[in-house]
Amino acid sequence: MALDSAAILEALDDDQRAVALATRGPVCVIAGAGTGKTRAITHRIAYAASIGTMDPHKVLALTFTARAAGEMRARLRTLGVPTVAARTVHSAALKQLLFFWPTVFGGRTPDLITSKGSFLAESVRRAGLTSSISIQNRDLMRDIATEIEWAKVSQVAPEDFIDEISKRLIKPRVNPEQLVQLYTAYESIKKQELAIDFEDVLLLTSAMLEEERDVRERVQDQYRYFTVDEYQDISPVQQRLINAWLGSRSDICVVGDPAQTIYSFAGATPLFLNTFTQRFPEAEVIRLSTGYRSTPEITFAANSLLRVGSMGQELVAFNDHGSKPSVQGFKDEQSEIAGVLSDITALLTAGTAPQEIAVLARTNAQLSAVERAMNKEGIPYQVRNTERFFDRTDVRDFLKQVRQASVIPAEDSQWIDELRSIAQPFLTGESIDGIAALLHLGRELDADPNFSPKTLRGYLREVEDRVQQNNPPTMPVITLATLHAAKGLEWERVFLIGASEGILPLTNSGNSASLTDAVIAEERRLFYVGMTRAKADLHITYRAEASRFLRESTLIS
């Protein structure tokens, strides 16, 4: 069926329509929070396909999370262009790398490391650092993984690591000399085990396209038109890969928001967004400024913060007026959490759906304290963090037991009881939300008349599909998330806790005066991201000294 180009444009506002009409690249879209950027870029692809400017089979639409890629695919299907390849940068690179591996590299394809934990633990042992680095310290091991990932996506070799660290605005929490030892050991172990990590996928695919002319020509023939979402968070190696895909052509549309650059610790840089028009002087620049998410009151505070840092596109709120964001101070963390939980309980009692509420914090440690309090009060919740759901130890152990039990299938009517029985031992302690979500998924499937077969094997098939799409199950409960993990999400009511000096902006020493301007700027962007997750109500709390960002956003004097 032919696409109706006029109908595609009717659903857009003036700025979004300008994006859709810019069917020839290069195009740069500066899109503020909640301005409908996904709508704009998917309609651009659909409109270009409807008028014959783009062949949808030759479009590669890139984003940075599986959830965002899935949303993009769903919207493109609805618009009548289901053949567009909408993928994460990593999945697109991995697909190409594995396809060409036998002819380019030869031998068996390497194993993909989805979690660095065991490799890093062995690296600590090989480097002889067990006396100074505890592999049981999850936060420390996560910091080490982050530093190695930063080095690799920034294309920094172990021998150059210390020199590059000295130039970095945000210093590592781990001793640089030890990091070099661990980085070297980690790379050696991977080579020995014939394994690659996600950073290797980007590096190897980039090198393959640069060095293998036949491969490059085949890939460039397959993909002619490019869309890159969240372009403010691109890393040097990701830009290198995009350059290899694009070649000498200019049919590219990038979308980003300088005010939401919050991943510098992972190698992301707004440099490529900010210099796009220098690389493509003929580029059309379009700004999306109508905010459809938040009330005018929340938008006003967010705009005030933007002006301080000259960070990005100011927004004009589309929605009706609501209540002004509230700010409340407490003497300590315990009283702060008690106050927040009291407000949440009142909302739930008044009929607010729990899935409309989120508690956002700067650090995982803050969320752990909230978890303990919610468990004590019996308030249901789920945690969203940057750790991949299906890589969690409790989730993997639970699914392993389900697989073992599925060998001897239960009767159709009994499978959900067996799943419940397997889950029961896991539903103790503090972090039970992952298993609870998997059990909730089972109940939903059991009640679905279209789900078949109603067995543990059928359940596992659904879970495996979700693993492939990185689409974890959720529950209708309150969400707890770090500010980094909350990016791209929204809730009716948001509680942003810990808006205190020393926490937001975060400092290891407790002395905010020691922070550089660059670090403060990124922390300010994090605060902006947190504020703009709220649709109707924003409640901000602090303890001791209020964050400077509260004054900058005019929420306190």
Model-derived features with residue positions:
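P-loop NTPase Walker
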Residues: 1-106, 110-111, 217, 247, ...
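Conserved helicase NTPase motor core
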Residues: 5-21, 25-33, 40, 60, ...
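Helicase P-loop NTPase motor core
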Residues: 29, 33-41, 282-284, 290-379, ...
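Conserved beta-strand -> loop -> alpha-helix junction used to position metal-binding or nucleic-acid-contacting
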Residues: 83-97, 115, 377-401
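Conserved two-lobed SF2 helicase motor
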Residues: 85-91, 197-205, 475-484
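Conserved AAA+ ATPase "sensor/coupling" helix adjacent to the nucleotide-binding pocket
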Residues: 100-101, 122-127, 301-310
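ATP-hydrolysis module of ASCE/P-loop NTPase motor domains
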Residues: 103-195, 291
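Conserved helicase C-terminal RecA-like lobe
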Residues: 371-373, 392, 397-556
